[in-house]
Each structure stands twice: as C-alpha cells, then as structure tokens.
C-alpha cells in the first residue's frame, strides 16, 4: 500500500478521546487535511489538538462529512446514525481506527473478542509472548489505541476488539482469532442479540486460525464465512480442555491449575483460549507456561481487596454485563454469606439469567443505580438502595468472618461513575474503611 495515499486528502475523524487523537497523529504524519467532529461540547483530548486541525463540536457537521474523502468513526457512534448513513449513501468510505491499523500492520495479529474475558485473555497472551522473547504490541479496546502501536518494531500484535470496532473493520486477516463467548450486551445499540453476535463474527473473516468455545455454540463461525483451521476449547472434551486439574493441549498437560496465579473456573477457560491462540501464533511452550505462572489478572476483574477482617471483599467492577456476573457466580466457593452488589446501567439487557443464581439462601443482593429496582426484583432476598456507598454502609455491621462481599454489578457504571475503574476504586476504598 502506498505510503502517501492519504496526502492532501480530506479526512474527517468523528469522535476525539484517546482513539481520535491517535487517528489525528496518524493522518498528520501522512500529510492529510484533518477535520475533527465531536458531538460533545468539550471532548476529552481537545487541548492536544494543533491549530491546523479543524474542529467542530456539539453536533455532527453533515457539510464536513459530505466533503470528506474518508471518514474515520469512533466506535462509540453507531453506523446507523443518520448523518453517517447519508455520507455512506453519497459514496464516502467510512472506517474505524482498527481498519486503518490492519491496512498498515506488518506483523501477525492475534485478535480477541467476546462478551466477557477478552481483556484477561489479551493481556495473558501478551504475557506469554513476552515470556517467549517476542516483541509484542498490545492494544485496541484495551490500553493503547492500535494506531499508536505502528512503527515500533513489534513482531506480534495482540488486539482486544469490541463489537463496535469490528463493525467498521473490513480487512482484518488475523493469524489467530477468537470469540470467547457471547452473552447479551449493548442491547441499547443492537436491535437483537443476533445483530450483536453478527458484529462479533466479523473477527473470523480470513483468519488463518479460528479458536471457538465448544461450551458456547454462538462462538462458531457462520457456514458462509471464509475461515482457516478451526480449533476448539471447552471445560471438557475438546482439543484444549481441563483434565484432572490440568490445562491440556490435546493429550499433553500444559500446566496444573494450582501453578497459576489466576483463580476460578472462568479464568481456567480464559487460559485455555490463551493457550490455543498462543500455539496458533507459534509462541513456544516455555513462554506459554511462564506466562500462565506469572500472570495475576487485571485490576477490577474478580480482584480481592486486601483487608484484615476475615471477610473476602472482591472487586469485579469490570463485570459490566449479565454474562460476566454469571461467570463470577458460577462455581463460587463460599463458606458464609455472599453479599452481592448489583446495579448501574443495564443497557437494556435481560437480567433473568441471574435469577436462579441469586435465589440462594446464602446470597443477599444489594441493588443500586439506574436499574437497581429491576435487579432487586430477581429475588426476595434483596435490598434496594440509591448508591453503592449506601449498600456498603448497610452491609458493614452485618458481615462476619467467612463472608464475601462481591461487587459484580452486571451493569455499566456511567449512570453514577465516570467508568468502571472509578466504581471499583471506590469499592476498594469503602471495603478498607469498613474494617
């Protein structure tokens, strides 16, 4: 692809923030004419724009869109937005930053999506590659925007991709790709669960290796899709499976589960997916094993908060959808009462999957936020409060040694917090104050 294909072209970037700024830097280097649109009056990152970048805030500028040679869309904006559809109908190409990245990337790409676990698997595979001595670039929907990884001499890219990012990606040819699982999420954006799944399935297009979850048939590619070698992981009876507390690749044991820092059955399945991806990309067994031994998981993902009260306080604030909370509750080892904190913005999700799991005599649900009332109706053993802080204040005098307080909200945080990290940090602070 010619280096100067964007020189002098009018490029409209819709949406600023970290990703938008990475697009601005990319096109500035290509000597394009850049204009930025953001529907917010004061978008994050506005102070980093140079004077030669045209800026329109507060709305979508249709005149600018229609004058573009190329539109680069933030994943936060739906393709169905009327102004974007008008531009598409006028013959203007609309892409996302991942599409730009894959057109330029020179090293193999491992691509990871799924409703839950994708950040864990992305960081775990990256750890395996590092342990194998491979110079690896990790980013996408986690950490660093993909375009910022270019021209750094990386030998392998590991990308976490959201359904929103995949909607505007057309040229991905991953070395290895996976959909870890599919459960309802973003129902405020998609017409149905099947539309959401269809967006995820785009990750498999022209992939050399496709890794599917045999415990979740929704992760299987469509018959019409052009995919390469199919590999399978599952709890039992798959190429990558758990046998006698060992993670196995075929007939070979890779590691005993008690040698891993990651805990929980859901994380063992995440580890199986990571092993399958790593092997498909040619990461050696030593790197895979050392990665599994060293990797301790992500902040806000089933993370124990250190306290000295004998109560297990667990921050799972990254559980922003129902499937993630289901994964946290399945097989949870409990000796006392579980005080479960649920709430936030459910994004139109169906909470009924939680009903059987929370209707247990040893579980008390404290429900808060925008969808707190709907969540409280799942069980008679629930308490409805306005905020997470109120919930913890009520729980504090009740907990005793052997109990667990679990923040696994099954909802996004944006109704009461800036992001799930802020929610998790507040939980950790309140947990330590509770002692």
Swiss-Prot record:
A family per Pfam: Mur_ligase_C
Gene Ontology process terms (BP): cell division; cell wall organization; peptidoglycan biosynthetic process; regulation of cell shape
Gene3D superfamilies assigned: Mur ligase, C-terminal domain, Mur-like, catalytic domain, NAD(P)-binding Rossmann-like Domain
Domain of life, source organism: Bacteria
Record-listed ATP binding positions: 114-120
Signal sequence extent: none
Location of this chain's protein in the cell: Cytoplasm
Alphabetical UniProt keywords: ATP-binding, Cell cycle, Cell division, Cell shape, Cell wall biogenesis/degradation, Cytoplasm, Ligase, Nucleotide-binding, Peptidoglycan synthesis
GO molecular function terms attached to this record: ATP binding; UDP-N-acetylmuramoylalanine-D-glutamate ligase activity
EC number: 6.3.2.9
Example of a GO cellular component annotation carried by this entry: cytoplasm
Pathway(s) annotated for this protein in UniProt: Cell wall biogenesis; peptidoglycan biosynthesis
Recorded catalytic activity of this chain's protein: UDP-N-acetyl-alpha-D-muramoyl-L-alanine + D-glutamate + ATP = UDP-N-acetyl-alpha-D-muramoyl-L-alanyl-D-glutamate + ADP + phosphate + H(+)
Broad EC category: ligase
Keyword match Cell division: yes
InterPro entries, per the entry: Mur-like_cat_sf, Mur_ligase_C, Mur_ligase_C_dom_sf, Mur_ligase_cen, MurD
Role played: Cell wall formation. Catalyzes the addition of glutamate to the nucleotide precursor UDP-N-acetylmuramoyl-L-alanine (UMA).
Family: Belongs to the MurCDEF family.
Protein name: UDP-N-acetylmuramoylalanine--D-glutamate ligase
UniProt organism field: Haemophilus ducreyi (strain 35000HP / ATCC 700724)
Gene: murD
